[in-house]
């Protein structure tokens, strides 16, 4: 799946070192809910355990063929899936790459997988992510108080949803 300079492709074993580096980067993991630090051996086990599963899609975001982040869909079931994204390379942030990659993933979700809706959770303090999600057409549906634990503290999260029809009207011609 490709737009002008942005491409998303399936996550491969040789992407493990980038994922580990990106997730362990303090500039990226403030709002991530991982058991940190990630290590390559455990991530390799994760990769082999999840390879070939049809209830998830893990991908790499490339900009001009350079891997710059991860994106995907989890819990693909009954016409729904949970979206995630981390742009790992700081020098590529703020350039619209995350939006382009998100649009590509959502096109795949709605056109190829025939999903009805894609949802996500984001912490209330993660303002840059909320701006991205709203630019892509996600709608903030509710506040879930104390719904996750991040670094030993309960955190509030927003629940966002985008339906196939909402995506089509927001992203015409993209």
Identify the role of each PLM range.
Residues 1-18, 63-174:
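Acyl-donor (CoA/ACP) binding surface of acyl/acetyltransferases
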Residues 19-20, 28, 43, 83:
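Hydrophobic pocket/interface hotspot
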Residues 23:
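Residues forming the ATP-binding cleft of Hanks-type serine/threonine protein kinase domains
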Residues 26-27, 54, 113, 136:
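Structural motif
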Residues 27-46:
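Conserved GNAT-fold acetyl-CoA-binding loop/helix
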Residues 30-32, 59, 169-171:
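Short, hydrophobic secondary-structure boundary micro-motifs
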Residues 46-48, 147-148:
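Short, P/G- and charge-enriched loop/turn segments at secondary-structure junctions
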Residues 48-60, 69:
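A short helix-loop-beta-strand connector motif used in the catalytic cores of GNAT acetyltransferases and
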